[in-house]
Amino acid sequence: MLRTALLGLLFITTAKAQFQFFEQMFGGGQQHQESSSQGGNVPSDSAWYQNTYNGAQCSNYLCPGTLACVAVPHHCPCAHPQVEDKFEFGEGSAICASKGGFKAGETARKIELARKGLL
């Protein structure tokens, strides 16, 4: 009888500890939302971005990644120019690729090799 009671107590304490762990890991529901609006992490919905995008004044093209107003889409700047190189394709489009520690111009060379199927 004592053994059964001790096993039951052990089971309950272990289960409670697990639930507390998961509650702490995943923010505990409402408590997480409150802390994010008080200067914590940014909420995971896209309302801020959509409101900013819809409220931006641009008579030409509004870049979706940076919200910069440019004449044509391939003139959009990279969101993180310190770590990204911009590569413009001949057909009026562009991409930003991670510099990845390569020497200057290496990213563009690798992109060209990939476009030709050589990489």
UniProtKB/Swiss-Prot annotation:
<feature type="signal peptide">
    <location>
        <begin position="1"/>
        <end position="17"/>
    </location>
</feature>
<protein>
    <recommendedName>
        <fullName>Long chronological lifespan protein 2</fullName>
    </recommendedName>
</protein>
<comment type="similarity">
    <text>Belongs to the LCL2 family.</text>
</comment>
<keyword id="KW-0732">Signal</keyword>
<dbReference type="GO" id="GO:0036503">
    <property type="term" value="P:ERAD pathway"/>
</dbReference>
<comment type="function">
    <text>Probable component of the endoplasmic reticulum-associated degradation (ERAD) pathway.</text>
</comment>
<dbReference type="InterPro" id="IPR034543">
    <property type="entry name" value="LCL2"/>
</dbReference>
